[in-house]
From Swiss-Prot:
Name of protein: Motile sperm domain-containing protein 1
Transmembrane segments: 159-179, 191-211
PANTHER family for the chain: MOTILE SPERM DOMAIN-CONTAINING PROTEIN 1 (PTHR34441:SF2)
Domain MSP, first and last residues per copy: 16-143
Physiological role: Plays a role in differentiation and/or proliferation of mesenchymal stem cells. Proposed to be involved in epithelial-to-mesenchymal transition (EMT). However, another study suggests that it is not required for EMT or stem cell self-renewal and acts during later stages of differentiation.
Species the sequence originates in: Homo sapiens (Human)
GO CC terms: cytoplasm; endoplasmic reticulum membrane; Golgi membrane; nucleus; perinuclear region of cytoplasm
Sequence motif: Nuclear export signal, positions: 205-208
Gene of this entry: MOSPD1
Claim: Calcium is one of the keywords in the record: no
GO BP, one annotated term: negative regulation of transcription by RNA polymerase II
Transmembrane helix as UniProt keyword: yes
Cited InterPro entries: Ig-like_fold, MOSPD1/3, MSP_dom, PapD-like_sf
Classification of source organism: Eukaryota, Metazoa, Chordata, Craniata, Vertebrata
Highest taxon, organism lineage: Eukaryota
Length: 213
């Protein structure tokens, strides 16, 4: 005898609801944006009923505000803005999608979608560009204030390593050359001609580096 597989009991209000997009933006000067589509996804193994509610239902027309979604399917919900006036610019309205099992009345989950009417897409893009520019300038100013003093300190003169190498090269050139008999300097400090040429070459490079800074 096969045991019937029982579906786990779902807690009211805890079921995740998948809707795209989560924000609707209508532009007054672009009539093509006055109609937008919400897509409700059902990734579950059971059918869902849905219902669309709105905080300002007089401003919108919701096509198929209630219906059902088959398991692992999706449904498109068309929303039209029917009150495009300047007094509504910038006002944030909210849609709430509630879902439940077909055999139940209690709402298993809900999702809110915000809707905003703006005067123009171009103005919106301009505002976003200005915002990005201000953020970029702020970041640049912060970078300059944070790092410029350090850079100036570094570039104000030669490094200690450069000075040390220069002193070593000068000292090497002042040491006696191999073969000099009349010298008070110990023999192991006598340098060959090739060694002195290398020291002179390095000293020249160091001098050029110091002059460039």
């Amino acid at each position: 005898m096969h045991q019937q597989k029982r579906q786990p009991e779902l807690v009211e209000g805890n079921l995740p609801v998948f809707v795209f997009p989560t924000e609707l933006i209508f532009y007054a000067d672009d009539q093509s944006t006055h109609k937008q589509v919400l897509t409700l996804y059902n990734p579950y193994e059971f059918a869902l009923k849905f219902k669309v509610l709105c905080t300002t239902p007089n401003k919108y027309v919701v096509v198929d505000a209630a219906g059902a979604v088959k398991p692992q399917c999706c449904v498109d919900i068309v929303i039209r803005h029917r009150d495009v006036r300047s007094c509504h610019y910038g006002v944030i309205d909210k849609f709430r999608l509630q879902v439940s099992e077909q055999s139940q009345r209690k709402a298993l989950g809900r999702k809110e979608v915000v809707a905003t009417l703006l005067p123009s897409a171009k103005e919106q893009q301009k505002e976003e560009e200005e915002k990005r520019l201000k953020e970029h300038l702020t970041e640049s100013l912060f970078f300059e204030q944070s790092f410029q003093p350090e850079n100036r300190a570094v570039s104000s003169g030669p490094s200690l390593l450069t000075v040390f190498l220069g002193v070593v090269c000068i000292a090497a050139l002042m040491l006696p050359t191999l073969g000099d008999v009349e010298s008070l300097v110990p023999l192991y400090l006598h340098l060959s001609v090739n060694q002195k040429l290398v020291a002179a070459y390095i000293l020249g490079l160091i001098t050029m580096a110091i002059l460039r800074t």
